[in-house]
């Protein structure tokens, strides 16, 4: 009986385990959904920002890149920009997708919520992000830390 239960569990659990790591099906319109936890400790700039946040990057099958970012900004730092850069953990890299830039006004709100559609720079596609997310990071810049206040590697 135990052997029968084990075989049954292995037969039906395996497809579930395999399916959980697969990007959304093409019929759903989404190529991949990526996340990054944003914190100063991840920055290469020496940032001592107390802000923390989360970014979600959704890449649609047509290549559209949508983003949603929430930042808890306890000390009301002035945030001026946010981007996706290409570089591994611990390395600063070039901007490949602008997220939060002018003409969006700088903000020092305690709870910052940004969302929209982002246009990647030439040479970068949403498919690149999906294929190797850990090669990219999101970071947000403040007036005190113009090189980057909070950062998180995409996963």
Would you name each region that the model predicts?
Residues 1-8:
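Bacterial N-terminal signal peptides that target proteins for export
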Residues 11-12:
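Hydrophobic alpha-helical transmembrane segments of integral membrane proteins
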Residues 4, 15, 20-82, 86-155:
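Metal-centered catalytic cores of metalloenzymes
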């Amino acid at each position: 009986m135990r052997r029968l239960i084990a075989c049954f569990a292995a037969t039906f659990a395996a497809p579930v385990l395999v399916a959980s790591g697969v990007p959304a099906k093409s019929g759903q319109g989404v190529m991949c959904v990526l996340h990054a936890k944003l914190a100063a400790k991840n920055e290469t700039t020496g940032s001592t920002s107390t802000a923390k946040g989360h970014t979600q990057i959704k890449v649609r099958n047509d290549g559209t890149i949508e983003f949603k970012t929430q930042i808890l900004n306890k000390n009301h730092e002035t945030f001026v920009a946010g981007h996706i850069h290409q570089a591994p953990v611990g390395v600063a890299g070039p901007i490949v997708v602008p997220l939060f830039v002018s003409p969006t006004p700088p903000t020092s709100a305690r709870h910052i919520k940004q969302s929209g559609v982002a246009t990647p720079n030439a040479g970068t596609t949403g498919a690149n992000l999906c294929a190797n997310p850990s090669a990219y990071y999101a970071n947000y810049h403040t007036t005190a830390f113009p090189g980057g206040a909070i950062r998180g590697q995409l996963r």
